[in-house]
Amino acid sequence: MPIEPGQEVIFVVPIRKIKKRVPRWKRAPRAAKFVREWIARHAKAEEVKLEPAVNEKLWERGAEKPPNKLRVKVVVEVVDGKRVAKVSLA
């Protein structure tokens, strides 16, 4: 069941899934991309916008050690007929 526009939902994104598949020095950039893909799939959104705080949390311990999971709040809005998911820290 997709998220209704304007509804707030809290997700826990399992970043650990990609940590062993990516070289150590690429982990934080790949984690940011994974968060976008995961939210797009689960929120049924065509576009995903991450707040700067989410990116800072991913990079907090450097490129090699992103967190294993990330708790985020997602709000879906319809802009010009496209579903846009806005992601912030929960």
UniProtKB/Swiss-Prot annotation:
Keyword Ribosomal protein: yes
Kinase as UniProt keyword: no
Pfam families per record: Ribosomal_L31e (PF01198)
Transmembrane portions of the chain: none
Any one GO biological process: translation
Record InterPro entries: Ribosomal_eL31, Ribosomal_eL31_dom_sf
Family: Belongs to the eukaryotic ribosomal protein eL31 family.
Listed name of the protein: Large ribosomal subunit protein eL31
Organism of origin: Thermococcus gammatolerans (strain DSM 15229 / JCM 11827 / EJ3)
